[in-house]
From Swiss-Prot:
Entry-linked InterPro entries: Dehydroquinate_synthase (IPR050071), DHQ_synth_AroB (IPR016037), DHQ_synth_fam (IPR030963), DHQS/DOIS_N (IPR030960), DHQS_C (IPR056179)
GO annotation, cellular component aspect: cytoplasm
Principal cellular location given in the protein's record: cytoplasm
Residues the record lists as binding Zn(2+): 180, 240, 256
Gene: aroB
Record-stated family: Belongs to the sugar phosphate cyclases superfamily. Dehydroquinate synthase family.
Species for this entry: Chlamydia muridarum (strain MoPn / Nigg)
Listed name of the protein: 3-dehydroquinate synthase
Length: 373
């Protein structure tokens, strides 16, 4: 079964199996398919795709890149360009990225720049990638530890989402993706929350598929209104302004989902402190929703996991200065939450200047709580 979730801003299909020949129906056999993945997924996920492509008469090439966030570098990017050039791959060939956010970010960026643009298909293998990284055409690489500093907007030709692939994920890694689901619920669609009430129910393919579809539609509807990230798309940065700063400081020792989880808690505290959030219980509800999936809700949780020395408040504030949204102020603007399911807007903008005083107080309070124990 192949189900079209939406075709805006680009097609996304929910599929029962990666062996389905129908997946390849729109691809021309005159050009090769270039599968790009890492060595773990080459064993776990790639075989059915390769087998099906070859049985249909496609010529295929496989390129393997290193695993993890540390692979999102110019070295990997240039390696792929050089491999494509060495193999004399024509620009009509389709690149097929098979992996989580890291693989898809790199493959999308290579596709957007090799021969000034090649078609590519995303085959996300993590929940984060299925409901977030594969949607909307943002791609890129890190510069040193600065997240996504070099990149482009380039939409995939298609996204093939196969929920059964997630059964090979460890539970904790699956939960990292739930952080982005909770983000979607809080900024735009509170009706996602009931699907998340019972973690055990997500072991059923039906419930999991429902969760994936609802999140894809939520993100796609936001991105479809603002591909270039000048307006409403900015609400998808909820939790990511502080989250990315923390990821940078922790240099790969915490997952994206964990960083975003704590980022959302801190940014909700900021929304309350600045009088933007209308519901005083919003923080309590958010923390409960995160804890249900064993997601961290404080800096203390992050440091306990990473086992690194505690940063100072000023180190966290200075990491924020690398944020791409930053203009002239000392702090980048933040996405704030008005109520569950509604990100705040201010004078037509979805990011608002933050009070240095309030943010410093919130960070210091969270850091001091660690010293008290």
């Amino acid at each position: 079964m192949i189900e079209l979730i939406t075709d805006k801003p680009h097609p996304m299909h929910l599929v029962d199996s990666l062996c389905d020949p129908q997946l390849f129906a729109t691809l021309a056999k005159t050009s090769p398919l270039i599968f790009i993945t890492n060595s773990t997924l080459e064993i776990l996920v790639l075989p059915p795709l390769l087998e099906t492509a070859r049985s249909l008469g496609f010529s295929v090439e496989i390129l393997i890149i290193p695993e993890g966030e540390q692979a999102k570098t110019e070295t990997t990017f240039l390696y792929l360009h050089k491999q494509l050039a060495t193999l004399t791959i024509p620009r009509q060939a389709t690149l097929i990225g098979v992996g989580g956010g890291v693989v898809l970010d790199i493959v999308g960026f290579v596709a957007s720049t090799h021969c000034r643009g090649m078609p590519f298909i995303a085959v996300p293998t993590t929940l984060v990638a299925m409901i977030d990284a594969s949607i909307g055409g943002k791609n890129g690489i890190n510069l040193d530890h600065i997240k996504n500093r070099i990149g482009s907007f380039y939409l995939p030709k298609d996204v093939w989402i196969c929920p059964s692939v997630l059964s090979s994920l460890p539970e904790q890694e699956f939960y990292h993706g739930i952080a982005e689901c909770i983000k979607h619920a809080y900024i735009a669609d509170a009706s996602i929350l009931p699907i998340l009430q019972n973690p055990a129910s997500l072991r059923s393919t039906k419930q999991l598929s429902l969760l994936i579809k609802r999140n894809c539609l939520c993100k796609a509807s936001i991105v479809g209104k603002d591909i270039r990230d000048h307006g409403i798309r900015q609400i998808l940065n909820f939790g990511h302004t502080l989250g990315h700063a923390l990821e940078m400081l922790f240099t790969g020792k915490i997952s994206h989902g964990f960083a975003i989880s704590v980022g959302m808690v801190l940014e909700t505290k900021l929304s309350l402190a600045m009088g933007v959030a209308r519901n005083p219980n919003i923080l309590h509800f958010l923390v409960q929703d995160l804890l249900r999936y064993q997601l961290p809700t404080s800096l203390k949780d992050l440091y306990a996991q990473a086992q690194i020395p505690i940063h100072s408040c000023s180190q966290i504030l200075s990491a924020l200065s690398y944020d791409k949204k930053k203009q002239n102020a000392s702090l980048p603007p933040f996405v704030m939450i008005e109520e569950i399911g509604l990100a705040a807007s201010c004078n037509g903008s979805f990011c608002q200047p933050a009070s240095n005083h309030f943010l410093t107080h919130i960070l210091k309070e969270d850091l001091h709580a660690m010293h008290d124990h």
